[in-house]
């Protein structure tokens, strides 16, 4: 293969962005210039969502207005609730999220308006409704009644309430909120580039986010947090961890939750999420997954010099919170809607159709024979 061909667009800079910057050389990630770790420390997810969408952190009045608009748009139409009830219970929640957002596009009165103002309003509506749709399916597939959203709860609290009927301890809510902040945006990743590619054809925001969700479902992208939990469940006990991971490496198996296309010496989001993973484990009085985590991480670094990515601590954290494993990536969706929406609006602002080239390696020109001659 020619050196001119960059499989996976490796190392290719395709555009500029103001939304976020990944700096692997100093192990840092910033949203609009603010370090993600600092945002986790001093802000709640709603503030970060506002920042990503509006380019600056909100003041008290701006945040109150943003939160009011989000809360007023949480409930779903009767038709969408009905459709979710009819979805097969075995459906993967990512497929439910993708379908729900697509239907939101059918129902939205501003679907054909792609002005920045309309896209901002639609982004907030998608952010508000997607957790409700996912929580509704979470309960339906368990044979339970849907719990409607409450306006006196923030996004993190409300999702717990709609899924479980109650809001957990504030430390667990904070850990969930931190995960939303860390998952909110990450430059030109696969799903974001998918959203921008769709947008470049002047398609609508619902279509672009639907495509992004489909991209995020893959285990090499968002689905990795689910695979991490499947791996830990296979290991079962800290006593098995050392043997399991060494055996996996000896067989040259892929160990999910490790490595990153950009970060080579460690994902900048991991230390923060690891800290909150420990806090949740302490509250739940369950150290098993923490012990497995540490053993597997040490072997991966010692033997392969491969560090964990943010999916590695997030998977067991969500598990300890009580979420089903196949809901881990849909939670990622709830958060990343903000990043996708910001990139969609940025693409619209200076658009050029994304149309790369391919080097043909198939047959040369061939003569077509009629059917009776073949």
Residue ranges with predicted function:
Residues 1-374:
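Non-transmembrane, aqueous-exposed alpha-helical and coiled segments at domain scale
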